[in-house]
Amino acid sequence: MKQELIDFLCKKSVNFSDEPSFKLVSGRLSRFYVNCKPTILHPRGMYLVGHLVMEAVKEAKLDGIGGLTFGADPVAMAAAFASELMGCPIKAFSIRKEPKDHGIIKWVEGDMQEGERVAVVDDVVTTGGSTIKAIERARSQGLEVAKAVILVDRQEGGLENVAKLVPDASAIVTRAELLEAWNKLKK
């Protein structure tokens, strides 16, 4: 299943360039760019992501799974759907980029209660900034962040930064795995 996801990502979501031409959130230019949305929002990609994320969190005894909108949303929803299919339902939630300014003011959207155990997910990690923001906001709403799962680790220190806040942090796929598959596909 993991190799199928890697191949799917290479076909739908990964771009490489000889020169640094892809602007990252940090503002830095990179030769490697991955936009996971075309993969995750495809029915087969959603199935693969959901099941692989659930495999990564199955021992954590979670109540919820979510992260910062929009990158984490399809990952969390795929995992929540897969959790129901697997007979161990876990609720999805989304963390706003800006707090809701009307009604009940809050960062977290979804059926989550203070004290519940959650995993924070993200589609891609470079520096870890977005994932760390999600962890901090989830904790500020009283959620216990027990695990962090990243779909693609660019292997630029972000996963290690996340692990400083959530020691149980892991990635489903690494940049090295994508590069290896990309090179095989291009031969």
Swiss-Prot record:
**Pfam families (alphabetical):** Pribosyltran
What processes in GO biological process is this protein linked to?
Answer: 'de novo' UMP biosynthetic process; pyrimidine nucleobase biosynthetic process
**Residues annotated as binding 5-phospho-alpha-D-ribose 1-diphosphate:** 96-97, 100, 102, 122-130
Note the superkingdom of the native organism. Answer: Bacteria
Query: What cofactor does its activity depend on?
Result: Mg(2+)
InterPro entries to which the protein is assigned, alphabetical: OPRT, Or_phspho_trans_dom, PRibTrfase_dom, PRTase-like
Q: Please give the pathway this protein is involved in.
A: Pyrimidine metabolism; UMP biosynthesis via de novo pathway; UMP from orotate: step 1/2
The entry's function note states:
Catalyzes the transfer of a ribosyl phosphate group from 5-phosphoribose 1-diphosphate to orotate, leading to the formation of orotidine monophosphate (OMP).
Task: Read off the PANTHER family from this record.
Answer: OROTATE PHOSPHORIBOSYLTRANSFERASE, URIDINE 5'-MONOPHOSPHATE SYNTHASE
Q: Which family does it belong to?
A: Belongs to the purine/pyrimidine phosphoribosyltransferase family. PyrE subfamily.
According to UniProt, the name of this protein is Orotate phosphoribosyltransferase
The record's gene field reads: pyrE
